[in-house]
């Protein structure tokens, strides 16, 4: 018989820097999960990733206090900022533009994010990422 799932915990944790302090400690502690076991496993799995890169993680908590977790790709916003070397998006995205991104850069980001997106094909994924870029005040070139 399969284990009984008691809940899911969604967090964004910097790669290789999971520790028991908030937000990880309280979120896992409420479910009675072993916080240090998660931190060690997460840090071990994210060794090859750029340190400090925020990674979404979905933790599945079971009734017997065990857990499993799935690490997703970094948020599109983070990848866009990294691609065009930007610190933060525009406070007024539709009037003040903060940078430009090309279709080639968008395709690279879309390929990296493809498994986490619901897009049917690469072109749809590029349009999705382009929408995220526009909403943070980045001018998108080559995408209608």
Swiss-Prot record:
- PTM remark: One or more lysine residues are methylated.
Q: Which GO terms describe its molecular function?
A: large ribosomal subunit rRNA binding; structural constituent of ribosome
Specify the superkingdom.
Bacteria
Report keywords, A-Z: Methylation, Ribonucleoprotein, Ribosomal protein, RNA-binding, rRNA-binding
Does DNA-binding appear among the keywords? no
Has the keyword Transport been applied to this entry? no
A Pfam match is Ribosomal_L11_N
- Which is one Gene Ontology cellular component term of this protein? cytosolic large ribosomal subunit
Q: Where is the signal peptide?
A: none
Q: Name one GO biological process term.
A: translation
Q: Transmembrane segments in this chain: where?
A: none
- Subunit and partners: Part of the ribosomal stalk of the 50S ribosomal subunit. Interacts with L10 and the large rRNA to form the base of the stalk. L10 forms an elongated spine to which L12 dimers bind in a sequential fashion forming a multimeric L10(L12)X complex.
HAMAP family listed in its UniProt record:
Ribosomal_uL11
**What protein family does this chain belong to?**
Belongs to the universal ribosomal protein uL11 family.
Q: What does this protein do?
A: Forms part of the ribosomal stalk which helps the ribosome interact with GTP-bound translation factors.
Name of this protein: Large ribosomal subunit protein uL11
